[in-house]
């Protein structure tokens, strides 16, 4: 019987890397961020609703959602985030559910890559929850480098979510990402072996 696994963690914890590795191991990944982009893609009903609620400033010169404007708006005004979520979340759920069911019908184990799985109380929609663990200092360093944020802004984004320690306590399994990519791969392989998804780990070798 195929399993549905919820993959989550903190911001900049390494979810994209783990998803890529899991796809190599034969899992099918349903990506919440990708579904969210599809929900408001150019010409979509979702984007039309965003314009209606948030005005023309929410749309850039290319007719796409102005992500910088909307990102700043919802980060600084929680009530605006709720309004945006009310538009996007139902569309995202439909996209992800359709994709998940298609993979399950084909007999695949499915990874639901959902950054805010606990924040949106979605843990009961999956069979297991796997959390990618890293330290807050590593999260902040990655955010400052990747997103060109100040330390203050990086802290604000990290602390806007449930702490990674609390998420780890609520998880069925925790994937350690305190080291480099090779160590992450080894930790993931160990979990997959323990859970019977792969035959044996392949430590020390890169694909």
From Swiss-Prot:
InterPro entries documented for this protein: Depp_CoAkinase, P-loop_NTPase
Pfam family, any one: CoaE
Name of the top EC class for this enzyme: transferase
Protein residues bound to ATP: 12-17
EC number: 2.7.1.24
One Gene Ontology biological process: coenzyme A biosynthetic process
Location(s) in or outside the cell: Cytoplasm
Catalytic activity: 3'-dephospho-CoA + ATP = ADP + CoA + H(+)
Keyword match ATP-binding: yes
A GO term from the CC aspect: cytoplasm
Keyword set, alphabetical order: ATP-binding, Coenzyme A biosynthesis, Cytoplasm, Kinase, Nucleotide-binding, Transferase
Annotated family: Belongs to the CoaE family.
Full protein name: Dephospho-CoA kinase
Species of the source: Staphylococcus aureus (strain bovine RF122 / ET3-1)
